[in-house]
């Protein structure tokens, strides 16, 4: 659940990674913007926010781990020849991978009364001080037991602390059954997949609350006017083409898949050699899921350490398939424009529950009252 904003200057990204870790999300997000986002950014404002320590209290922002996984999977490995389907321009997919951590939003009427918030669209790159204040306020409220939905909050807070935490492969609250979390995850994967392949009833002008996806009518009933385009491109007219929206939707799906391999989000068993998905030998099965964690009662810094580059390196050195293997398989299915009914068996396999799967909790290694354990990526 982390982020990374690649502004034009590498020094700015270094400053942010070194000085300003944010509260935890999943694989980390860096405060550097993609090329797609840079046109929206106010670089001087962002620099002042960083230099002023706006993000110092947060552990979720630091290194561009999500982006690195996406690049390795879609732009193909450094070893060996360039394989068919390897891409160079993945800017929209990267924007989508970042969207789950930093969805653009506008305040509900009567809300948004933070000192540094202005009218209009809020994102880390456009209103960084406002963004940090909203995030930290949401985190504090969630720890007090406030439940966030479309009735009382915005996308940023809902996705990190509220009813949309499944955007990071996490449970909405402690004690949620693994079956319920999995249903929420699979509903989002269905929506983003069908959008990403350009399915007829999932074009950018469709109303999100009316989509034929389990749970969407209830989840977005307070957002009746939202189109798919509004969800993924609020405040950014430059990406309002069908192709751009499709690739952003794919990136959002990849974020959920990637987060499911981050140990601060999901506890998995180790993969078992020879076990495959849906009887296909070219689909080796990842480790089964033992628990979806929930964030509000986690220690944000422990969560954040699990999302750093060393955590990814340890994960990639373990048993396969690892997260990059899985993302590559998903990308291959997407390039073939595989219909949802044919792609679903693989994604269901990626989120297979162990027979001993438990209800959600912060996770023993991530509780705010637990000793400082070494944390790492899941199996």
List the predicted regions and their residue ranges.
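N-terminal, motif-rich segments that launch catalysis or mediate targeting to/interaction with membranes
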Residues: 25-245, 263-379
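Catalytic glutamate of the conserved HExxH
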Residues: 252, 256, 260
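N-terminal signal peptide c-region/cleavage motif recognized by signal peptidases
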Residues: 19-21
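Bacterial N-terminal signal peptides that target proteins for export
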Residues: 1-12
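Active-site alpha-helix of zinc metalloproteases
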Residues: 247, 251
């Amino acid at each position: 659940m982390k982020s990374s904003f690649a502004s034009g200057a590498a020094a700015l990204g270094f400053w942010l990674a070194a000085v300003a870790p944010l509260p935890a999300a999943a694989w980390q997000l860096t405060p550097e913007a993609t090329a797609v986002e840079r046109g929206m950014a106010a670089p001087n404002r962002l620099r002042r926010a960083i230099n002023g320590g706006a993000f110092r209290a947060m552990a979720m922002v630091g290194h561009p781990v999500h982006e690195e996984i996406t690049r390795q999977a879609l732009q193909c490995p450094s070893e060996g020849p360039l394989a068919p389907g390897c891409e160079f321009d993945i800017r929209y997919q990267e924007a989508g991978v970042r969207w789950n951590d930093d969805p653009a939003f506008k305040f509900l009427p009567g809300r948004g009364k933070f000192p540094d918030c202005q009218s209009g669209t809020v994102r880390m790159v456009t209103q960084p001080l406002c963004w940090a204040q909203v995030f930290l306020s949401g985190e504090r409220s969630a720890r007090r037991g406030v439940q966030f939905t479309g009735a009382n909050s915005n996308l940023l807070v809902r996705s990190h602390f509220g009813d949309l935490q499944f955007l990071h492969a996490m449970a909405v609250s402690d004690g949620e059954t693994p079956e319920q979390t999995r249903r929420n995850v699979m509903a989002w994967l269905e929506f983003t997949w069908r959008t990403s392949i350009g399915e007829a009833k999932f074009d950018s002008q469709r109303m999100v609350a009316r989509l034929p996806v389990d749970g969407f009518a209830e989840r977005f009933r307070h957002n009746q006017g939202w189109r798919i385009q509004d969800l993924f491109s609020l405040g950014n007219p430059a990406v309002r083409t069908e192709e751009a929206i499709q690739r952003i939707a794919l990136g959002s799906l990849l974020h959920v898949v990637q987060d499911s391999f981050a140990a601060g989000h999901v506890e998995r068993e180790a993969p078992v050699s020879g076990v495959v998905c849906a009887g296909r030998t070219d689909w080796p099965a990842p480790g089964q899921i033992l628990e979806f964690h929930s964030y509000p009662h986690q220690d944000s810094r422990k969560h954040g350490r699990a999302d750093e580059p060393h955590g990814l390196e340890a994960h990639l050195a373990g048993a396969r398939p690892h997260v990059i293997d899985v993302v590559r398989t998903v990308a291959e299915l997407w390039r073939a424009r595989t219909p949802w009914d044919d792609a679903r068996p693989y994604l269901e396999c990626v989120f297979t529950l162990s027979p001993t799967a438990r209800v959600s909790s912060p996770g023993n290694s991530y509780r705010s009252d637990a000793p400082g354990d070494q944390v790492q990526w899941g199996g």
